[in-house]
UniProtKB/Swiss-Prot annotation:
UniProt keywords, alphabetically: Chloroplast, Plastid, Ribonucleoprotein, Ribosomal protein, RNA-binding, rRNA-binding
UniProt entry tagged with the keyword Coiled coil: no
Keyword Ribonucleoprotein: yes
Name of the molecule in the record: Small ribosomal subunit protein bS18c
One GO location term (cellular component): chloroplast
A single GO molecular function term of this UniProt record: small ribosomal subunit rRNA binding
Cleaved signal peptide residues: none
Pfam families the UniProt entry points to: Ribosomal_S18
Disulfide bonds: none
Localization of this protein: Plastid, Chloroplast
Major place of residence: plastid
The organism of origin for this protein: Phaeodactylum tricornutum (strain CCAP 1055/1)
Oligomer status and interactors: Part of the 30S ribosomal subunit.
C-alpha cells in the first residue's frame, strides 16, 4: 500500500485568518485569481472555509482583485 505524504499547512491551526492580510491570502490564490483547492494547499476544512470567506470579503472591499491584471 502506498502512503500519501501529508502536506504541512502554511498556517497554524490557531492563526487568525483576516481579510486585511493580503500577503497571507495571496498564498492561496492562483495567478489568474482563483482560490486554490484544499488538496493543493494542505489546509483543514475549517481553514479553507475561513480562507474562502476572507478572500471573497477582500474582493468585495476592493482590497484584493477578482481577476489578475493582464500586464504584457
Amino acid at each position: 500500500m502506498v502512503s500519501k505524504k501529508q502536506k504541512l499547512s502554511p498556517i497554524s491551526l490557531n492563526q487568525n485568518i483576516d481579510y486585511k492580510d493580503i500577503d497571507l491570502l495571496t498564498l492561496f490564490v492562483t495567478e489568474q485569481g482563483k482560490i486554490l483547492p484544499r488538496r493543493a494547499t494542505g489546509v483543514t476544512v475549517q481553514q479553507q472555509r475561513r480562507l474562502a470567506k476572507a478572500i471573497k470579503r477582500a474582493r468585495v472591499l476592493s482590497l484584493f482583485p477578482f481577476v489578475a491584471s493582464n500586464s504584457i
